[in-house]
Curated annotation (Swiss-Prot):
NCBIfam families: PRK09489.1
Organism expressing this protein natively: Yersinia pestis
Protein name: Ribosomal RNA small subunit methyltransferase C
Any Pfam family matching the protein: MTS_N
Record has Cytoplasm as a keyword: yes
Enzyme class: transferase
Lineage: Bacteria, Pseudomonadati, Pseudomonadota, Gammaproteobacteria, Enterobacterales
């Protein structure tokens, strides 16, 4: 994430516009542009923990991680630069939150790759700001307008839920598999045939569906759930609460904030960061797993069959097995073996 994205390069084409402004960056920001941006003031609201990590050393208290922006973070900001995310519903949720706090007259810049659906920004915000396209470059569009009216925003109204067996799953915009259980997670769950116990880490927990379903089958599991998405963290907490399941839920960029070792790590790892294909998280998950598993501990993941995970698993663990597969997905498992005995050490 060190290089600038095409969307940020489009913003820099208009850098003179922002020199005297107090700018708030928000949305699917994936680079360090705010840390080097020339403006009278720069603040960032992000709901992605790894983006917060990237920027916090430089911007310190001027970057906020969380589901909802606060009036304190947005104080004194007169300009919003919003990066359009992959999910239209997520854009609606975030912009409704931001524009309900920013004062009337705030300049709004919306930027995003054309394939992300940024063109729909004009229609989406029509009741609150009249946006017009002011630039098109690098397969991106940049739109500008001023806030004419603040929208009403009630975070509780954005919650949705669905059922998986006897489990109620609570979800928010931007959370993976918001509307129903995805087929990859379904295949992963099908490989748990017997009750088990011990400590289990769910990396990239989404709405907490894996832990909640497995907790019904194996109530003695000690769960830790993690995700980079603030929406996923809140959704997981809500799912666990409504199903009366106790677990620790934390923000972590794969293992960045994980303490201790586990009997098992499970995951349906993402291979996108926003709309960009990225195997970084999955590679970190596999390569770092042995440092977070007990001897005999297992990493069990589901992934699209075409992704190059077998070689990564073999490099990290020495071997792997395929527990289940269908036309699209495979469930892989790898086990931490005992280290070879050093023949030089005395018995």
């Amino acid at each position: 994430m060190s290089a600038l994205t095409p969307a940020s390069e489009v913003i820099l084409r208009h850098s003179d516009e922002f020199i005297a402004r107090h700018v708030l960056f928000a949305g699917d920001l994936q680079d360090a542009l705010p840390a080097q941006f020339d403006a009278a003031g720069v603040r960032v609201h992000t709901n992605q923990y790894h983006h917060w990590q990237l920027l916090s050393n430089t911007l310190e208290e001027n970057v906020q991680f969380g589901l909802l922006a606060t009036a304190e973070t947005l104080a004194a900001c007169d300009t919003l630069i919003y990066y359009w995310p992959k999910s239209k519903q997520e854009a609606q949720f975030q912009l409704a939150n931001l524009l309900s706090i920013l004062p009337v007259g705030t300049d709004i810049f919306v930027v995003g790759e054309n394939r992300s659906g940024v063109r729909s920004a004009e229609e989406m915000l029509a009741d609150f700001a009249q946006l017009a396209k002011i630039d098109s470059a690098r397969r991106c569009g940049l739109y500008h307008g001023r806030l004419d009216k603040q929208p009403e925003f009630d975070a509780d109204a954005w919650w949705e839920s669905y059922q998986v067996g006897g489990v109620t799953v609570k979800t928010l915009p931007g959370v993976f598999s918001r509307d129903s259980l995805d087929s990859g997670s379904h295949l992963l769950l099908s490989t748990f045939n017997e009750p088990f116990k011990g400590s289990v880490l769910d990396v990239g927990c989404g709405a907490g569906v894996l832990a909640s379903v497995l907790a019904q089958q194996s109530p003695k599991i000690k769960w830790t759930l993690s995700d980079v998405s603030a929406a996923a963290i809140e959704a997981s907490r809500a799912t666990l609460a409504v199903n009366n399941i106790e677990a620790q839920v934390i923000a972590s960029n794969v293992y960045s904030d994980i303490k201790g070792r586990f009997e098992m790590i499970i995951s349906n790892p993402p291979f996108h960061d926003g709309i960009q294909t990225s195997l970084t998280a999955a590679e970190m998950l596999i390569r770092g797993a042995t440092a977070h598993l007990h001897v005999g501990g297992k990493l069990r993941i589901v992934a699209n069959s075409f992704l190059p995970y077998p070689a990564l698993l073999d490099a990290a663990f020495g071997s792997h097995e395929v527990l289940a597969q269908n036309g699209r997905f495979k469930v892989y498992q790898a086990t931490v073996g005992r280290p070879p005995r050093d023949p030089k050490k005395k018995r």
